[in-house]
Amino acid sequence: GEVGEPAQLPERARDMSDPAHAGNRLFTEARGHLQQMGPQSGLRSQQELDNTAGALALSAQKAGMSRIDHVVAGTDGRALFAVQGVMGDPAMQRSMVQREAAAQLPLEQSSQQLAAEASSRQEQTASVIREQDQNRPRSL
C-alpha cells in the first residue's frame, strides 16, 4: 500500500479460510472435524459447514482455546461442542454453538469478530507485561 495509509489486513485475509487470518488454525481444525462427522453434523451444504466451522473457531477463541481436538454434537443434536484436550479429561476445555445459528452466521462476520478478539487479546497481554515490568523492583 501507499505510505501513510492506515495499516490494514491484506484484502485476501478477509476470512478464516486464509492462512494469513488469525483464526485459520481453529477454523481448519473445526472444519476437518465437521467433515469427519458427515451427516451427523446436521449440516446441509458446504456453506453451512464453513459458516459453522467459523462459528466454532470464534467460540473456541473466546473460550481461550488454542486448538480444536474434537467436535461433538450435543445429545439433542442442536448444539455442537469444540473440545481442546482428551475427551472425558476433567482438564479439557470446550466451547459450544447452536448448530442452526452457527450454520447461518456468515463466515466473513465470524472472521471479523475473531480477528478483533485476537487483536484485543494481544493488547491485553502487552499491557499486562508492561504492568509487570513497571511493578518489578529495581535493583541498585
Regions flagged by a language model, labelled:
Residues G1-L140:
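Gram-negative host-targeted secretion-system effectors, predominantly Type III and Type IV
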